Each structure stands twice: as structure tokens, then as C-alpha cells.
Amino acid sequence: MSSRKSLSVVMIAKNEAGLLPDCLRSVAWADEIIVLDSGSEDDSVAVAESLGAKVFTHTDWQGFGKQRQLAQSYASHDYVLMIDADERVTPELRQSIERVLNAPDDGAVYSCARRNLFLGRFMRHSGWYPDRVNRLYANSRYRYNDDLVHELLNIGDAKVIPLSGDMLHLTCRDFFAFQRKQLRYAEEWATQRHRAGKRCGYLSILTHTLGAFVKTWLLRAGFLDGKQGLLLAVVNAQYTFNKYAALWALGRNYSEK
């Protein structure tokens, strides 16, 4: 029988002192916790260190993908669980992870179902649940891509095995902070697309925006999530509008990017 694989929990963070304690406590059972701080101005570093994390700093921001790559490079154990400060590993998910570590398939990647919080409600529809993300994998085999935002784990043709148990994701606790983050993501998405030679027309802005609302509200049953479902459909449409309008503006030199 093979011995248990060891686990490094890895995260990138900036100004997350308020969220880090519950996050780190939910993974305190791991063999190692790595936090790569990108220049916090609050007590994030001290909080992480006080809870047993190994903290490193890198302020030359080149996007989420490369920051995750660097964070993983500090991990010294067999498996990596990549998480964010606004996520929590539930006891059920921990049990699933422990089962993998006791009987691993190193060629596989394991996905977690995220339960996303939006304005006081953990969403069950709207495309926000189960919201599976590939987060548990063999350290020596897989890395994140270079994308500035919405980065993904490069898994090739690896088998993806779903884990049981949810990961809680406190996505939208503060509406204004959430809006600011969405605007930043839209800007980075448009910048990356523009650099890759992508362009869009005026009509494309409108069709993608309308499509985002219909997809969230109707096709993904957002109406079953009540008021929050309707608000999320509008927010998704707004985010999509910002992405494509920014790409349109960049293509016509209406931006300094």
C-alpha cells in the first residue's frame, strides 16, 4: 500500500487580513500553507504568519496566472490545493481530499464544487453552483497558465475527478468592493484580448451583454435564486458590457492601455 501523499495549500493574497483567519483555519490540517503576498498594506502578512503560514512577497504584478505559478514554486509537498482568501474548505471537502492523499492518482486533477455567496445568499442556480474548479493536483505535474485574469490550470487531457463536499466562496460580501473587482477583471480581460489581436464591433457589445443576462436569468435558472438571482443576472450583463466595451475602446485608441 502506498504511503499518504503530503499536501501544500497555496494561495495568493493582497489586503486580505479580514478574510485570512477563517480561510487558514479551514486548512490548518495541511502539511504546509504557502501565502504569496503581492504588497498588502494591511496586516495580511502578520495574520498569515501567526496562523502558521509560510509567507513570501512578490509585488511585481504580472497577472493572476503568473502569480499563482510563483506561489506554487514555493510549495514543497506532493500535492497542491490552490485556494483564495475568500474560500473555506468544509469538513466534507477535507475528508474527500484526505481520501485522495491516501489513495492518489497522480495523473488526475481533482475539482471542487464552490458554493458562492452573493449578497447574503449562497446561490444554488444562476450558473454559480456547483461552479466546479480544478484545485487539487500533483505538484510536479501541473501549473497555471499565464492569463492576466480568469487563469486556468493547464491540465492537457488529464482526467478530472470531482470531489464531494463544497468549498464555500464568499464571492460578494460587499457590493461596492465586488463591483470594483469586476471592473478590474474586465479591464485586464480586455487588455489581454487586445494584445492577442482580438477586436470587437459595436453590435458585439450589445449581443454579448444581452446574452449574459439571458444565460444567467433564464438558461441557468437564475429566477430560482430569487432577488439575488435577478441582481446577479444584471451584474453579469454589466460585467460583460464592461469587457467588450473596453475591448472596443482599446481597438479604437479610446484608452491609454
From Swiss-Prot:
GO biological process: lipopolysaccharide core region biosynthetic process
This protein's record includes keyword Magnesium: no
GO molecular function: glycosyltransferase activity
Leading EC class: transferase
Family annotation (InterPro entries): Glyco_trans_2-like, Nucleotide-diphossugar_trans
Cited SUPFAM superfamilies: Nucleotide-diphospho-sugar transferases
Similarity-based family: Belongs to the glycosyltransferase 2 family. WaaE/KdtX subfamily.
Name of the protein in its database record: Lipopolysaccharide core biosynthesis glycosyltransferase KdtX
UniProt source species: Serratia marcescens
